[in-house]
């Protein structure tokens, strides 16, 4: 049985609220619009408020240099999340035999984020590698480990990290500044020891013909075909919930659900389309923004203390690629 033994997450240090982005940075769409259309109150950045105010992040390469000087990078966020996951699992870094990492906004082309995180945490030699499926990377990591279950070392550390604000355009007519936050999540996974969550195999797939619908150029800003991606995400997430429910014989109204933390409003659309109760839907986007692949696992880390043994969680996520994934977790 594959299980998650420890969960951790870490957010960047500098808070950006809606009033600051509208009144000082000058984003044209005001807080009322953000509340009704996105449902996001605040997010966190590896950058400084002064930098965003003065430059609008016109040159993402300058943002990367600033983040490095401030000591906050996708790797440092991932390492912070990893430390929390290791502590909850009650194991030492030296016991980890494999690190699998996702990083949507790497500051280094090479080496892998997995090796940089391993070095930061004091993890020894192993077949550490990056497995990137953008926002759906948590599902991809769980699927990969389920496929490899018999060959896994005793403890695996998975991390999902990104600093999207370094690739965000804060020009006045762009709403991306309201959406993105920086953060990371981590999970200690084992196929030999029971933990906090039982992991059932995930389903993952992609739509290559839509590969450029969500894109970050090597040294450019994030951009996407917003309306098309939103419509696809709502439709596909509903399909994925249904697929998992059918596979495992579940009534979706009796389980917990969690979706990609893209926006509060998008998740409401999904719940309304399927007639699912909001009280059994887990989310945190309103208080930290969209932190990409770390979104769902950070929700799990925050929600687990209020869940009880036997509770089941169906998760589904759609992201760049276009890539998607879904699966089932059970509280142990």
PLM regions with names:
Residues 8, 102, 132, 156-162, ...:
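Short beta-strand segments
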Residues 79, 105-107, 119-124, 133-153, ...:
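Claisen-condensing/thiolase-fold acyl-transfer catalytic domains that form or cleave C-C bonds
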Residues 152-181:
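Flexible, glycine-rich active-site loops centered on histidine and acidic residues
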Residues 30, 74-89, 232-248, 296-303:
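Short, well-ordered amphipathic alpha-helical segments that serve as non-catalytic structural scaffolds
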Residues 1-72, 172-235, 239-242, 318, ...:
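Condensing-enzyme catalytic core mediating Claisen C-C bond formation in acyl metabolism
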Residues 69, 222-285:
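A contiguous, well-structured pocket-lining segment that forms one wall/lid of small-molecule binding clefts
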Residues 4, 52-58, 63-133, 247-267, ...:
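Conserved beta-ketoacyl condensing-enzyme motif
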